[in-house]
């Protein structure tokens, strides 16, 4: 655990965030997060998102679909507070919220995941604050379908890994998913976070995630993701083309 604190310092050196006034967050809970007429552009370029209207309710599992370049990742980073809006309104339970506050609500898992030199445990605890419950650690690893892989390693959670070796691309992605599940943020965004998994492994991971009572958004291009969500949002050219409920065998709150 002590070694993980050192690894956390490494993470802070890698993820450099612009200085900003820290927003006052009421609590890490919400009923709905709403984007109304939100647009985004990079500098003087053409809008990459145009007049987005999207309301996310607590406990929903949403698939954000669309072709490459449709604006899925840009919207995901807007939802995560990493990009700022050029126009429109963002509210949390009908109160205005800034991107600094929004960032505290969301854990974002990108498609390209990274492994830092250190142990499996250190990598799992990067960015994690507070005491780690062993049962919770084992549970999230099982949900991410990475526990068996870890247990087969020479030293288990104390096995040394690095970006250049030790883990396959799929294992890196599942490790990142487990790390996200350890976080306390109520909204999890997975941006093509299962793209490196074979269909059987992806199906197991998605089925596990669908049962977890947290709000999740999956940016994906595989139609197989649809069977694990309650709602499908389709994007075309920076706009939401459709937003409809999806049949889902699971129940959410």
Residue ranges and their predicted role:
Residues 1-14:
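Cytosolic ends of transmembrane helices, especially the final helix of ABC transmembrane type-1 domains
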Residues 147-154:
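Conserved H-loop
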Residues 24-27, 77-142, 183, 204-213:
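Conserved post-Walker A segment of ABC ATPase nucleotide-binding domains
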Residues 70:
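ATP-binding Walker
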Residues 65-67:
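The feature captures the beta-strand-to-loop junction immediately N-terminal to the Walker
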Residues 15-62, 91, 96-99, 139, ...:
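Primarily ABC-family ATPase nucleotide-binding module
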Residues 74, 107, 112, 120-123, ...:
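ABC-family ATPase nucleotide-binding domain "signature/switch" substructure
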Residues 33, 46-49, 101, 152, ...:
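ABC ATPase A-loop
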